[in-house]
């Protein structure tokens, strides 16, 4: 099945495929893997591809997209591609610079969706994680509304079809929504979301504002030491997911993905295994009962895998608020 048929309308009139392919990989994974996996994903039916400047793999992901266009598998307009502006490019004059760098790496003319990756500005420069001599991150003071105005200009210039945010809490979303002279509101908020962190309150708030929630780490997480607390439980080992997978004759990953789709959440599935990439497309082939949805809702433990703890002293750190 082609996931293109399964889309959600964004507030600006564009449509986003509800199943997306995530391309982030820990540093030790060779970048060439991103090309290979993205090609497999497109062949399997994925049409929504998610990356970011920070992932430093856009050259490889772009190569996969362009090769699948060249061999006739897809046209450019069949692909929904997301990139994100990193924290060191929050100054208004740098937002478009970051996007143009991404487009150059990708060798594409536009992105379908451009997001502010985190609501925290860091010192501009070559380093994605600028640190002082004591190894402490160096922050920058930029009003998120100024960054947003630069995002609006990227949309007006045709470099991004839609614009949104990622890792924002309710207060930070409201700040943009209440901005005087707001031209375009964020179409989505991409956040960590899975049965252990189901984001129920944030989802309700976003729904009330016609903002789509997009789930990353929907299968738990890659568990990379730099970002993830190693003592956190492995989501896909959860016995409830395990028994439900048996009941539906699916995998625990498919149960976790289907859970999001039935809540109206756009979900990113990340895998570099050909078998699992193809398997994840089965999410459209079955439906969870409302009772089982309730059971999954009750798994919530507010466990955040990507805690962002290295940024926790940033004045705009998003995860202190309840949601």
Curated annotation (Swiss-Prot):
Residues the entry annotates as binding NADP(+): 20-24, 50, 166-167, 190, 216-221, 270-280
PTM annotation: Three forms are detected, probably due to post-translational modifications.
GO biological process: negative regulation of mRNA splicing, via spliceosome; steroid biosynthetic process; steroid metabolic process
Tissues expressing the protein: Mainly found in liver. Also expressed weakly in kidney.
Quaternary organization: Monomer.
Function: Active toward androgens, estrogens, and xenobiotic substrates. Also exhibits low 20 alpha-HSD activity. Shows a-stereospecificity in hydrogen transfer between cofactors and substrates (A-specific). Preferentially catalyzes the reduction of 4-androstenedione, 5-alpha-androstane-3,17-dione, androsterone and dehydroepiandrosterone to testosterone, dihydrotestosterone, 5-alpha-androstane-3-alpha,17-beta-diol and 5-androstene-3-beta,17-beta-diol, respectively.
Residues that hold substrate according to the record: 117
Active-site residues, as the UniProt record annotates them: 55
Gene3D superfamilies reported in the protein's UniProt record: NADP-dependent oxidoreductase domain (3.20.20.100)
Keywords: Lipid biosynthesis, Lipid metabolism, NADP, Oxidoreductase, Steroid biosynthesis
PANTHER family per the UniProt record, alphabetical: ALDO/KETO REDUCTASE (PTHR11732)
Site feature location: Lowers pKa of active site Tyr: 84
Pfam families: Aldo_ket_red
Name under which the protein is recorded: Estradiol 17 beta-dehydrogenase 5
Entry similarity comment: Belongs to the aldo/keto reductase family.
GO function terms (MF aspect): aldo-keto reductase (NADPH) activity; estradiol 17-beta-dehydrogenase [NAD(P)+] activity
The protein's Enzyme Commission number: 1.1.1.-
Signal peptide: none
